[in-house]
């Protein structure tokens, strides 16, 4: 939904933009029960959608709803100031960050970007490995493709909005650079990265590739990454991804929803879906990054 809204806005497709906003309306009125109240990062991240609609419409009802997700996430914190919803799974590096960054974009209030930066640095310290990639969790020492994609996309969204003089920007940028450099050596000849990034025998996975492409395109456009090297890698990824789209723009080879695993085989045996939203969204994010 977020990717569709940004793509519609960047292409000037007002009809699509309005249709997407209209589809949200029942969630404010007759279908409020479809919004989960559960205190879990995977449900909280939905708040990015009403916040994006607010940025497009300036209607305060969307701001109120979106901020309710961001503020409830910080209702309880650990002694170091991080939400107690943090699990130290790499997925969180997008789920938590994207919501708090979007709240900052909508309000300009520093507390939201500070939450995102604090969380990101804590996760970088705990999960990034010497090779630049990220374990799925401290007790799951595997470089899962989409999980690392969540990290790449989360850092990218944060760096897009994090003030240049923010005290944690240098640390986050260093983690981003280290990861981007690591990814270069694992990209397949087909342009895609693998289900387990460091296992070339594992299958090419599209949702991770879409997120890495998004991170690299954005990095090149903002001057964070060297254009010739990373632009070429991003282009190779994009051309590889479009080969996996069917006639209805459904992308295949998308890893199913995956909790942390405890063996290589667990990841290799995950089901590969077509049209799964985990894969559709990064295509839209990358398209949006190319248009910005």
Specify the residue positions occupied by each region the protein language model found.
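CBM-like carbohydrate-recognition segments
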Residues: 7-22, 26, 30, 35-47, ...
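Inter-helical turn/loop segments and adjacent helix faces that build the functional surface
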Residues: 11, 103-114, 158-170, 219-226
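Long, well-ordered core segments of solenoidal/helical folds
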Residues: 15-36, 61-83, 110-133, 173-192, ...
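Extracytoplasmic mature domains of secreted/periplasmic and thylakoid-lumen proteins
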Residues: 40-99
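Active-site lining segments of carbohydrate-active enzymes
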Residues: 83-87, 94-110, 118, 122-126, ...
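Short linear capping/connector segments at secondary-structure termini
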Residues: 134-140, 192-200
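Oxyanion-binding "anion nests"
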Residues: 152-197
């Amino acid at each position: 939904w977020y990717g569709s809204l940004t793509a519609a806005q960047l292409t000037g497709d007002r009809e699509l933009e309005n249709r997407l906003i209209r589809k949200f309306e029942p969630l404010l009125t007759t279908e409020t029960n479809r919004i989960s109240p559960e205190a879990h990062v995977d449900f909280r991240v939905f708040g990015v959608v009403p916040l994006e609609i607010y940025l497009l419409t300036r209607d305060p009802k969307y701001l109120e709803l979106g901020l309710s997700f961001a503020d409830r996430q910080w209702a309880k914190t650990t002694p170091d100031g991080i939400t107690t919803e943090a699990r130290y799974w790499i997925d969180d590096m997008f789920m938590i960050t994207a919501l708090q960054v979007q709240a900052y974009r909508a309000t300009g209030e520093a507390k939201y970007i500070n939450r995102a930066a604090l969380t990101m640095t804590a996760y970088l310290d705990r999960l990034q490995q010497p090779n630049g990639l990220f374990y799925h969790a401290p007790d799951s020492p595997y470089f899962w493709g989409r999980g690392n994609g969540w990290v790449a996309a989360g850092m990218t969204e944060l760096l897009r909005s994090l003030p240049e003089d923010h005290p944690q920007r240098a640390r986050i940028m260093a983690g981003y650079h280290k990861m981007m450099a690591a990814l270069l050596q694992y990209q397949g000849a087909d342009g895609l990265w693998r289900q387990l990034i460091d296992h070339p025998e594992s299958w090419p996975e599209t949702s991770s590739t879409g997120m890495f492409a998004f991170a690299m395109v954005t990095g090149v456009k903002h001057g964070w990454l060297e254009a010739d090297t990373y632009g070429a890698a991003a282009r190779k990824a994009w051309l590889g991804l479009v080969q996996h789209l069917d006639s209805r723009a459904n992308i295949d080879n998308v890893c199913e929803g995956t909790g942390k695993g405890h063996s290589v085989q667990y990841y290799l045996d995950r089901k590969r879906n077509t049209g799964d939203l985990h894969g559709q969204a990064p295509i839209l994010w990358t398209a949006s990054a190319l248009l910005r």
